[in-house]
Amino acid sequence: MNKFTNLLIKRTASSLKGGDFRELFRKNYIPITQFEKVLLSVTSCVEGLKNPTDSNSVACITELTSNRALRKLQILMNSTPDGRRIIKNRPLIDSSKYSIKDLMAFPDDSLGRRYGEFLTTYNLEIDRAPVRYVNSEDLAYVLTRFRQVSLNDYK
């Protein structure tokens, strides 16, 4: 990423470890103006085209352009009892609660086991980058949850 993008992104050392989601949202949220949003979107798109393996650019673009999709996901989650429970309780799947070894101990057909297998297969970590530019705490949680559990359904 270029110097301008790094200034706007203001990387944080925090991850989704510990604390409740409200605390994490307040700690990581970076308010930006509409002009900054457009500029950061364009810059991230250019950086993403120059380096397609840069997940930071993809994450940034997602946060800046997915408001409508996040609202639809929130509506979809609220349409089922399990989804409403998840939205209400805001559980996080992160290294403060689980290790990959813990996930692999879950039953074969469980989300935990499949997630552990996915992380192991692709040599990934449990923690995901915090959401920084979504200005709604509820929608930021939906995106956080999406990042945590929607990685190709752990094929």
From Swiss-Prot:
It is found in: Mitochondrion inner membrane. Belongs to the COQ4 family. PANTHER family: UBIQUINONE BIOSYNTHESIS PROTEIN, UBIQUINONE BIOSYNTHESIS PROTEIN COQ4 HOMOLOG, MITOCHONDRIAL. It is a peripheral membrane protein. Its EC number is 4.1.1.130. This is Ubiquinone biosynthesis protein COQ4 homolog, mitochondrial. InterPro entries: Coq4 (IPR007715). Component of a multi-subunit COQ enzyme complex. GO terms for biological process: ubiquinone biosynthetic process. It catalyses: a 4-hydroxy-3-methoxy-5-(all-trans-polyprenyl)benzoate + H(+) = a 2-methoxy-6-(all-trans-polyprenyl)phenol + CO2. The lineage of its organism: Eukaryota, Sar, Alveolata, Apicomplexa, Conoidasida. Lyase that catalyzes the C1-decarboxylation of 4-hydroxy-3-methoxy-5-(all-trans-polyprenyl)benzoic acid into 2-methoxy-6-(all-trans-polyprenyl)phenol during ubiquinone biosynthesis. It comes from Cryptosporidium hominis. Pfam families: Coq4. Its cofactor is Zn(2+). It comes from the Eukaryota. One of its GO terms (cellular component) is mitochondrial inner membrane. Pathway: Cofactor biosynthesis; ubiquinone biosynthesis. Its main location: mitochondrion. Keywords: Lyase, Membrane, Mitochondrion, Mitochondrion inner membrane, Transit peptide, Ubiquinone biosynthesis.
